[in-house]
Every structure is written in structure tokens, then in C-alpha cells.
Amino acid sequence: QDPAPAQVQAEPAAPAVGTVILRADYTGPALPENYTMDQISLGELQTVTPLLGHLRSDYGYRDHPVDGEYKFHNGVDIGGQEGDTIGAFADGTVDYIGKNDTHGLYLQLDHGNGIKSFYAHCSKLCVSKGQLVAAGEKVAEVGSTGVATGPHLHLELKWNGLHLDPAYYVEFLSA
């Protein structure tokens, strides 16, 4: 008697981009427009942690460390040393680069499917507008430009303009 043929199981596909994969149990103040505490699927996007460091400030409402005002923090702050490498969150194109009083030196990457990552307080930008970058490729260096209490990466993630909590998608060093 012949043995039964081996069963081949396909890898399950990632949920479609934009699918809610974790509904947050959030009971705090009303969120600003275009912000969510839910985890949203990024589909098949292959991602990396741009800077492995300690989480210095969460996404969400907080007392601002400089002005003391209670307001929403659009991203996460990841601690690092001045000049540490910041890698691209995923393959993408440099959407824009710039400098202002709040964010200091900053850049945004477009990863397609409405997914964008934003990096602020950099000491140096290592890319130019329109440049293609690979996941993990050096795009900037950690700094404390703009309104900052010390060297760190301020990282924001968006899907079709909806701000996401980056902590769902990156790793941190434990305390």
C-alpha cells in the first residue's frame, strides 16, 4: 500500500493593508482626527527596526518634556547616541527632507500602499529627495536637532494619512 501523499500547506497570506489586526482597548481622551490606537496591517511589507534603542516616549497623550503641555505625541522616541545609524523602516522612496524648529532635520519615506515613515531630530540626513532606499539602509544619524531633550529618533508611521502607533511595528531594548 502506497503511503499517503504529503500535505503541502501554503503560508497564510498577510491581512490586506489597512485591515485592523488588533483593536486597542483605549479609554483615554478623544483621539485627534486621523489618529488610531488600533494595530493596522501593513500587508506584505517587510520591515526592520530603524534604531534599536530604549523607548523614551510612547505614542499618545503625554506631558511634553520641554513645554510641559499635555498633548498628543505623534510617534515614539527611541533613545540613541549622537551619530548612531538610523535605517529605513522598509524599502521605499525618499518623499521629502527638511529642517524646522520643531523637528530639526527630518525626512519621510514612502513605502507604497499609503504607508509612510517619518524620522526627526536627526544630526545628519544621508539621503536625497526621490532616492530609492532598501529596508535597513542608512538614511540618517541620531541627533537632538529641533525641540529635543537629548539624542533620539522620533519615529512616526502613517497609512493613508492615519497616524499609527509605531510600537506595534518596531522593537525596543528592554529597560
Where are the regions a protein language model picked out?
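Zn2+-dependent peptidoglycan hydrolase active-site motif and core
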Residues: 71-74, 88-126, 151, 156
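Short, well-structured beta-strand-loop connectors
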Residues: 85-94, 127-142
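Glycine-centered loop/turn positions within well-structured domains
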Residues: 76, 84, 117, 125, ...
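Residue-level recognition of beta-strand microenvironments
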Residues: 58, 97-98, 125, 142-145
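Terminal presequence/propeptide segments associated with secretion/organelle targeting
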Residues: 1-10
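Surface-exposed, glycine-biased beta-strand/turn segments
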Residues: 12-103
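Conserved, short, structured surface segments that act as functional micro-motifs
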Residues: 105-113, 131-175
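Active-site acidic-Proline motif in GNAT/NAT acetyltransferases
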Residues: 80, 124-125, 129
